[in-house]
Structure formats: structure tokens, C-alpha cells
Amino acid sequence: MQISQFNRLKRSALLFASVLLLSACQIESEPKSEFEQIQERGVLRVGTLNNQLSYYIGPDGPAGLDYELARKFAEQLGVKLEIRPAFRQAELFPALKKGDIDIIATGLNQTSQAVQRFRPGPAYYYVSQQVVYKKGQLRPRDVDQLIKYQESKDEKAGNEDSNAGAETLQIVEQSQFVPTLTALQKEHPELQFEIIGDADTRDLLKHVSTGELRFTVTDSVELSLAQRLYPDLALAFELTEDQPVSWFTRRSEDESLYAMLIEFFGNIKQSGELATLEEKYIGHIEAFDYVDTRAFIRALDNTLPKWSPLFQKYSEEFDWRLIAALAYQESHWKPKAKSPTGVRGMMMLTLPTAKSVGVTDRLDPEQSVRGGVEYLRRIVARVPDSINEHEKIWFALASYNVGYGHMMDARRLTKAQGGDPNAWADVKERLPLLRQKRYYSQTRYGYARGDEARNYVENIRRYYQSIIGHVSQKPAIDEDTEDLQVIPPLDPNLLVSGAVETLAEQVSGAVEVTPPPEENAPQEAEQTPVPKAE
């Protein structure tokens, strides 16, 4: 009896142990959340497009709106950032679906097709989809006029089966424009378009500019950026109203990463960091001067190559392309430039400023560039540390133009009106008020042409963006997705201007950068009327 009891107890103990073991196995085999997997891996894998808005390699390492946002998100998660750049949008969604990347961060529209398959994050800016044509050519003002043009092309081809109409309108494969035109085609069966798989939107915009293609579709921000390189591009008509732009994650029951993304964008919106980054990358793109841009593009091809070695030689902690943009704003890269106000030379220095920086001959381009950079360096050093490092340069350039005291007056006025005196987006709106007596009479330094200072800085920013795009339209980035770089979170104290060690050494192997083939009044430039976009 005792043996039987013992056997029963033994079997019960074994059964209990088996249950515990099975439970432990189930607990161990329970899949980890997406966020936990990223933490365990120690790396956030981000897919993005290689362009001058989302991600590119500058003299000081990686840059771009989506890159900087992704870097901040990785820092919040406590992991390193792995950027997986692509030249074509068609590469991104398949990579996300397969699990090769965790997030797409490149400013894509929340189209119905994309939202059905993937989960969009919070909107961080808005764009409209626009039909683009070449200035001086036929401008369709709506879909019906576009169809009439395509039909006329078919008739000229003399073949009912001709694809001539479709060839007049091309869009990129798997772009947000495909579902828009597909839906439009259901309403207008005569509408023809061709989907291109071996090009990106910038390629098609270039083809429109050169006359190889009649029409394409892009978004409003991309068009504004592209016009700085291809000034012949113009808006024909809008296909959509403003649509939200966001990042994308995989759709699944696991919302751990998505929840972190919601929290991240909520935090940076509330702190003002998002507004600061958007001002940095797209706050200057709205104004477009067709005549000025055409002249600038010609100068990029014909004049910049002569002077770029000089800008690179003396730029030091500054991006040489920024110094080039400053010099173009001052003199249009003319070393003998003179103004009735007394400023002269490549950097249009006043005589007192020239003496203060050791320039003996203002018409000597080497002395002028060296002196201009030194003067700018001194102004940057005076800008208050309460201003973000990457925005200090805009305050310094405003001071370069209108004087440091007037710039500080504009900051004080901004604060008095409830704005942020450390945000260029707020201060630039108050600079023009320094012309009005009701405002300048209450300032320390009085009247100033603050509107000119604002335009001066915004012009330099546009020239700078154009030079970036011009010298690195096709950067040498390794497209092999098996060999990708890991970029660690950056020390927030690093100077964006590059006064510290750059990231160039950190970004190696997977990304190769091809070397590119005080009151200082600016020269009064003659303003040419801008023709209407027809």
C-alpha cells in the first residue's frame, strides 16, 4: 500500500514537473515585441531616400530632415541608428514588408493604398500632388486639357495604337502618385500615363526640364526644391489638396514600436524641435525667382568651378558651400564687384571691416574670402548660446547684413510679442518691423532695413540648398543592401557647423562621398520682374 502511494506521488510529482517545464518553455518561446527586438539588437534600421531633403552626406557627415528626426528617435529608444538609403521609392515598401527595415522615414504621402498595407505615423508636414510641365510649353490647367493634349499627340503620331499620349506623362513606380492617377483614370478613361521603374522623381523632373518629357507628377515640396536646380519647371495644376506626410511601419497586432513613434512625434512637436528642423530644411523654399534662379544655375556651371577651391580652402569649420552661397549673394562671384555704398570685392567688405580682419586689398579674391569668413566666424561667436547650434549661422548672417545690434533688437521684439527669440522662424518675421517707427522707436539701435536682412538670409539659404543639390546630385552610395553603415547617436553638443571632428570617418564603407567634380551692407542688386508661370 505504501509502495502504491509512493508511486502515485511520484507520478504526480513528475506530472507537475512536466507542466512546469512546458510552461517555462512556452514563456521562453513567447515572441518578443518589435520594440524589444530593436532593443535587443541595439539598432534601429531606417529606410530612406537619398535626396537633398530626407538624407544626404555633407562635409560634416549625414544630414537631412528625416535623417535628423530618425537620429533623435533612435536616441529616444536608446539604440544606434542604421540608415539604409535607397535611390528609388519602389525599394522601400518591399524592404519594410520583408522585415529588412523597421521604419520608412522619407516623407511619403498617406495615400489610401499605402495606409491599407502599412501603418502611417503622425503627420509632420503636408504636401499636395502636382502636375509639372516645362515653362514656355503648353500648360494644361486641368485633367481635361491634359487629355486633349495627349489626344493631339496620338493624332500626330498617325496610329490609333500609339503610346505617344502615355509618353507625355510619366510617374515613378510604386510612388504615391500611382494610386492617384489610377483612380483619376477610372473617371477619365482617356487619360494615359506611363509608370517608370528604373528612375526616381528627380530624374523625371530633370527630363521635363530638358524637354525629353512633357509632364510628370511630384509633390509641392519636391517641386520647390527641384526648381532651385531646374528653374524651367513649373506647376501646371494640382491633382490633390494638401495631404499628410508621415513615416511608415509594418501593420501587425504588435503596436509597441508604433506607440513609441506616437510618443516621439508628440514630444518633438510640443518642444518645438520639429518646427526648428522643418524651418532648417524647408522653411526657405517657398519663394521662387525664375530669372534669378536661371542666372544662378548658369553661374553654378560656369563660375563656381573656378572659385570653389578658394571657398574650400578658407571655409574651415563652415560648409564651403555655405560660404559660396554667401559670396554669390554678396557679389555674384565677381571679385571686382563694387557698390556706391563703398563695399567691394567678392565678399563685399566695408573698409573698416576689411581692416579689422587684416584685408589690405578688398579686390583680391583670396583676401576677400579669407576676411569674409573670419568676420563671419567672429559674429557666430557672439551669437548667444541659448540659440541652437545649427540656427546660429542664420542669426550671424542677419547680423552680417544689418548689424549685430539690430539683430538683437529683433530678438527682443520677438520675445515681447510672445515669440521665441531663439528660433529663426520667429525672429525673421519680426525683422521687417524694424522699419516701422512704432517698433524701432522702442529699440536700442533704432531704424533698420530688417526686411532686407531677412531676404538676405533666405536667399543665401536657397543658394546653399541649390549648391548642395548641384554638386551631389548623384552621390556615390553603395546600393548593396547587404553592406550598410551603422551611424551612432550623435553627441547633442556637437557643432553642426563642423568646428568639431566630422562624421566622415564614422560613415565609411557603405557610403562613399564623391568629391565635388560690422555693418556690412550687401551690394544693391537690380531686381528683374519675374514673369508669370505660363
UniProtKB/Swiss-Prot annotation:
It is a peripheral membrane protein. The gene is mltF. Residues 507-534 are annotated as: Disordered. It is an enzyme of class 4 (lyase). Gene3D superfamilies: 1.10.530.10, Periplasmic binding protein-like II (3.40.190.10). InterPro entries: Lysozyme-like_dom_sf, MltF, Solute-binding_3/MltF_N, Transglyc_AS, Transglycosylase_SLT_dom_1. Residues 25-285 are annotated as: Non-LT domain. It holds the Pfam family SBP_bac_3. Residues 1-24 form the signal peptide. PANTHER family: MEMBRANE-BOUND LYTIC MUREIN TRANSGLYCOSYLASE F. The N-terminal domain does not have lytic activity and probably modulates enzymatic activity. The C-terminal domain is the catalytic active domain. SMART domains: PBPb. Keywords: Cell outer membrane, Cell wall biogenesis/degradation, Lyase, Membrane, Signal. GO terms for biological process: cell wall macromolecule catabolic process; cell wall organization; peptidoglycan catabolic process. It comes from the Bacteria. The keyword Signal applies. Residues 287-534 are annotated as: LT domain. Transmembrane segments: none annotated. In the N-terminal section; belongs to the bacterial solute-binding protein 3 family. In the C-terminal section; belongs to the transglycosylase Slt family. This is Membrane-bound lytic murein transglycosylase F. One of its GO terms (cellular component) is cell outer membrane. SUPFAM superfamilies: Lysozyme-like, Periplasmic binding protein-like II.
